[in-house]
Amino acid sequence: MSDAPTASALKTPVRVSGPVFFISDLHLSAGMPATAAAFERFVRTRAREARTLVILGDFFEYWVGDEELADPFHRHVAALLAELAQAGTRVLLMHGNRDFLLGKRFLATTQATLLPDPSVLEADGLRIVLAHGDALCTRDAAYMRFRRWTRKRWVQRLFLAMPLRWRLRIAQKMRADSEAGRALSANVAGEPRAAAMMGDVAPEAVDALFKAAGIPLLIHGHTHRPRLHHEPGGERWVLSDWDFDHAQPRGSFLRLQDGVLTAEPVTA
């Protein structure tokens, strides 16, 4: 379950070996077979070049508890991560806003290590602040209220005590409502689907995170707007989402090697 971010997570870096690959927002589900296939190819080819793979949230479209491992699709994806770990690539995982209920059973099955949000990573002589990114969208007051409630452990315990079929229905309803809201926003604003996916981060929240960490380098996902930003507090890299099941397929990862960050495409 989700860990509340603490000041100690920013002051105590997680030290890893490079090359390090960063991905986020794959939103894996059985309903997105081409995206899932792209991830499987990535795990069995490019990801083997990395000593460390960092997944910065929303790895799954939704996750309502570790009973999801009984589902063949989710079990196969978990096996892919375990296969990668057994091949020698360390897997680090951060919760996203869709999969913050990934728990101890999933971590044990995949041999992954959970990162608090935010965290600091140290590799190749660099210190990097890592976040999923949703906590930086502070101008979305309704979402921030929802986030505060759903990260409370007692709320999570109550939800996990429900029958699995109830939890799945709730998640599917929330997913449908979210998609409808995005489509409406895109139509009203006249924006393309990718640009209207969700609200962007608040500059003041980004600045506060830079100051709290004291590190001028940040990597996050969530917004589906991949780009390198030069902020007053430092460089901010935004990771791409992955989608190979709709028009305008997209997907990339960020490589850290020899102290240099580069964005590289993922092939379908």
From Swiss-Prot:
Keywords on record: Cell inner membrane, Cell membrane, Hydrolase, Lipid A biosynthesis, Lipid biosynthesis, Lipid metabolism, Manganese, Membrane, Metal-binding
Cofactor(s) for this UniProt protein: Mn(2+)
GO molecular function: manganese ion binding; UDP-2,3-diacylglucosamine hydrolase activity
Catalytic activity as recorded in UniProt: UDP-2-N,3-O-bis[(3R)-3-hydroxytetradecanoyl]-alpha-D-glucosamine + H2O = 2-N,3-O-bis[(3R)-3-hydroxytetradecanoyl]-alpha-D-glucosaminyl 1-phosphate + UMP + 2 H(+)
EC number: 3.6.1.54
Binding site for substrate: N97, R98, D140, S178, E191, H222
Cofactor, how bound (note): Binds 2 Mn(2+) ions per subunit in a binuclear metal center.
The protein's enzyme class: hydrolase
Sites where the protein binds Mn(2+) 1: D25, H27, D58, H224
Gene Ontology BP, a term: lipid A biosynthetic process
Pfam families documented for this protein: Metallophos
Bilayer topology: Peripheral membrane protein
Compartments where located: Cell inner membrane
Major place of residence: membrane
HAMAP family: LpxH
The protein, known as: UDP-2,3-diacylglucosamine hydrolase
Organism: Ralstonia nicotianae (strain ATCC BAA-1114 / GMI1000) (Ralstonia solanacearum)
